[in-house]
Structures are given as structure tokens and as C-alpha cells.
């Protein structure tokens, strides 16, 4: 089981500083969509240039022109790139092909997908590296969690890894870990903690069953 830190609300310098503080406890560091909107792909490059032994994910949330956008993210140092599960099949297939051609990985974000079971099966057959169930920020505000979606997707896929995101914190991560996802994505639960290093350490301990 892997742990990913999602960083959304910092500039690229502060994001790299935070990532380096917690890198002993995480497997993947994400440059979140808000940072990419604010600073562009150079934020991904800054992270890639300033951290080692950790994969860098660019949360592009691609919807179209997929092979080009994947190629650009890779050019700027991304190891993993995200595309939306609601994108056209042709876009997702092109994104997977471009990523794999460069020995990189593609994560498909299931945010806003209505028929999770059907789409997860399709994406699994297409060869997505990760399928991520994601309770977005706006739905978290309504008290929703990704647990049920995680169970649904995990029950139908055969090859892809299952990732889970959405409001996960050190005090709730054990419920998620109990469902045995392949990748747990924690954002503010680490980034906004009073002590991010301690929060990351607690999350790592939880996924290692300690």
C-alpha cells in the first residue's frame, strides 16, 4: 500500500519544502490542480528537481488533447499524471499509451463518474495504472466520504490499482486502510496539520498496520 501527499494550496517553493520534510513517509508527492493553475507545469518541474526517491504526480485532471497534455507533464518531470474518468475513451486510451511509452503511469480520477462499477471495469480493461475514487472538496463539505465508492470499485477491477482520496486524515485513515486500497491519498490531513511530519508519520504507520 502506497501513501501519497496531495499539495494544493501552496506555492511551488513551499510545496517542495513540505514534501522534503515528509518524504521519508510518503511514496508519491502530488502537485495539485490549484498549484498547476496558479504556477503552471514549472511547479511540477520544481518539485521533481528538488526531491529524490519519491514519485511526482501532476494532478492535471485532463479531459481532452490527452496525449499532448500527458507528454507535457512528463517533459516537466511528472512520474504519474491524472485524467478524468468522464473523459472520452479515445482520450483515456491516448493518455495511457503516451504515459506507458515513456515508462510513466496514468491515474484515472473517478470524480463525477455516475456509474462507478461500469466505468471502473472499462478503465481496468483499457490498462489504467490507477483508478482513484475521489470525494471532491465540494462533496466533503456535505459530509460524504469515499468509503462506499472504494468498495464498489475494488470489487470489480482485476488489473488496475485502486487509489482513494477525499478528506482522509490521520484519525480516519484506518477505516480506509481496512478496505485495502493500493494507494491512499492524503491532502490537508498532512499539509494543514499543526505538525505535518507527525501527521505523515501517523498515516504511514496506519498503512503499515502499526
From Swiss-Prot:
It is an enzyme of class 4 (lyase). InterPro entries: 3-hexulose-6-phosphate_synth, Aldolase_TIM, HPS/KGPDC, OMPdeCOase_dom, RibuloseP-bd_barrel. GO terms for biological process: 'de novo' pyrimidine nucleobase biosynthetic process; formaldehyde assimilation via ribulose monophosphate cycle; L-ascorbic acid catabolic process; one-carbon metabolic process. It catalyses: D-ribulose 5-phosphate + formaldehyde = D-arabino-hex-3-ulose 6-phosphate. The keyword Chaperone does not apply. SUPFAM superfamilies: Ribulose-phoshate binding barrel. GO terms for molecular function: 3-dehydro-L-gulonate-6-phosphate decarboxylase activity; hexulose-6-phosphate synthase activity; orotidine-5'-phosphate decarboxylase activity. The keyword Glycoprotein does not apply. Keywords: Carbohydrate metabolism, Lyase, One-carbon metabolism. Its EC number is 4.1.2.43. Pathway: One-carbon metabolism; formaldehyde assimilation via RuMP pathway; D-fructose 6-phosphate from D-ribulose 5-phosphate and formaldehyde: step 1/2. It comes from the Bacteria. PANTHER family: 3-KETO-L-GULONATE-6-PHOSPHATE DECARBOXYLASE SGBH-RELATED. Catalyzes the condensation of ribulose 5-phosphate with formaldehyde to form 3-hexulose 6-phosphate. Belongs to the HPS/KGPDC family. HPS subfamily. This is 3-hexulose-6-phosphate synthase. It comes from Staphylococcus aureus (strain USA300).
Amino acid at each position: 500500500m502506497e501513501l501519497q501527499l496531495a499539495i494544493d494550496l501552496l506555492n511551488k517553493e513551499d510545496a517542495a519544502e513540505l514534501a522534503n520534510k515528509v518524504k521519508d513517509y510518503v511514496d508519491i508527492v502530488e502537485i495539485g490542480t490549484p498549484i498547476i493553475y496558479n504556477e503552471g507545469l514549472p511547479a511540477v518541474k520544481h518539485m521533481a528537481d528538488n526531491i529524490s526517491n519519491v514519485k511526482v504526480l501532476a494532478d492535471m485532471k485532463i479531459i481532452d488533447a490527452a496525449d499532448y497534455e500527458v507528454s507535457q507533464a512528463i517533459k516537466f518531470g511528472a512520474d504519474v499524471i491524472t485524467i478524468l474518468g468522464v473523459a472520452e475513451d479515445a482520450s483515456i486510451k491516448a493518455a495511457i499509451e503516451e504515459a506507458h511509452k515513456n515508462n510513466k503511469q496514468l491515474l484515472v480520477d473517478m470524480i463525477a463518474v455516475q456509474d462507478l462499477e461500469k466505468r471502473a471495469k472499462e478503465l481496468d480493461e483499457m490498462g489504467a495504472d490507477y483508478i482513484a475514487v475521489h470525494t471532491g472538496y465540494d462533496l466533503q463539505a456535505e459530509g460524504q466520504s469515499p468509503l462506499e465508492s472504494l468498495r464498489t470499485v475494488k470489487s470489480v477491477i482485476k488489473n488496475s490499482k485502486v487509489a482513494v482520496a477525499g478528506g482522509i486524515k490521520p484519525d480516519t485513515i484506518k477505516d480506509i486502510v481496512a478496505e485495502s486500497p493500493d494507494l491512499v491519498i492524503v491532502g490537508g490531513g498532512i499539509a494543514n496539520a499543526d505538525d505535518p511530519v507527525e501527521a505523515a508519520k501517523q498515516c504511514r504507520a496506519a498503512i503499515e498496520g502499526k
